[in-house]
Regions:
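Short glycine-rich, low-complexity/disordered patches
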Residues: 38-47, 81-89, 118-125, 153-165
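Short, structured protein-protein interaction patches enriched in aromatics and acidic/basic residues
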Residues: 44-73
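A short, charged, amphipathic alpha-helix used as a generic interaction element across diverse proteins
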Residues: 29-36, 136-161
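Surface-exposed beta-loop interaction hotspot
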Residues: 98-117
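Amphipathic alpha-helical packing elements
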Residues: 15-45
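Short, extreme N-terminal segment that most often corresponds to the first beta-strand
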Residues: 1-16
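Short aromatic-glycine-(Arg/Gly/Cys) micro-motifs in beta-strand/loop hairpins
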Residues: 111-132
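Ordered, amphipathic secondary-structure segments that act as subunit-interaction surfaces
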Residues: 75-102
C-alpha cells in the first residue's frame, strides 16, 4: 500500500509536489531526503510529520525557507529557534503502532489545491480566538512569510496560521 507525502525542496525555484511511497519503506524516505532522516512532529495546521535530513546542518545543506516557515507556523516555540536545512518531506503522524501515515488530506489541499489564502493570528489575551484581515495571497508561502513577519513586528502575536480565503 502506498502513502502520499508532500515534498518541499530547499530550492524555491522548484515546486512542491506530492510523492507516493510504499508504506513502511523508510529507504524511500531516505532517498527523498538524501540521507538519514530525522522527524519533527507538528500539530498545526493538522497533526503531521516533517522528515528532514538528520545531518543537514552538519554537512552544510542549504536552508529550506518554505519548510522552516511551516515549522514556525506550527508552534511559536520554534520561531527563530531552529531552521530546516535541505529538502523536506511531509507525511502524516504515526498511527497507533508507530507506523508513518500519509499526509492528511486537508494539509495536502491547503498546500497544493487552495487558490487563495489568508493569514490569521492569535494575540495575547485572545484565548483561542483567531483574527485576520482582508489581505489575500495566491501562494501559501507568501502568506506564511507575511504573517511571520507580522509576528516579528507585533509582539502581541502568540501564534500564526494560514487558511483558505
Amino acid at each position: 500500500m502506498n502513502i502520499s507525502g508532500v515534498f518541499i525542496p530547499y530550492d524555491e525555484e522548484q515546486p512542491i509536489k506530492v510523492i507516493d511511497i510504499p508504506r513502511g519503506e523508510y529507504t524511500a524516505i531516505q532517498a527523498i531526503i538524501g540521507g538519514v532522516f530525522g522527524v519533527i512532529n507538528i500539530g498545526r495546521p493538522t497533526p503531521s510529520s516533517i522528515f528532514i535530513h538528520d545531518e543537514g546542518k552538519i554537512v552544510g545543506l542549504p536552508l529550506n525557507r518554505r519548510a522552516t516557515m511551516l515549522l514556525w507556523a506550527s508552534d511559536s516555540r520554534w520561531w527563530h529557534q531552529d531552521v530546516i536545512m535541505g529538502d523536506a518531506f511531509i507525511l502524516g503522524p504515526p498511527d497507533d503502532e508507530g507506523d508513518t501515515t500519509g499526509i492528511p488530506e486537508d494539509f495536502k489541499q491547503l498546500l497544493l489545491d487552495t487558490e487563495e489564502y489568508k493569514m490569521e493570528v492569535q494575540t495575547t489575551g485572545s484565548g483561542d480566538a483567531w483574527a485576520g484581515n482582508q489581505l489575500r495571497f495566491n501562494d501559501p508561502f507568501d502568506a506564511l512569510n507575511y504573517v511571520l513577519g507580522l509576528a516579528e513586528r507585533w509582539h502581541a502575536v502568540e501564534q500564526v496560521r494560514i487558511v483558505p480565503a
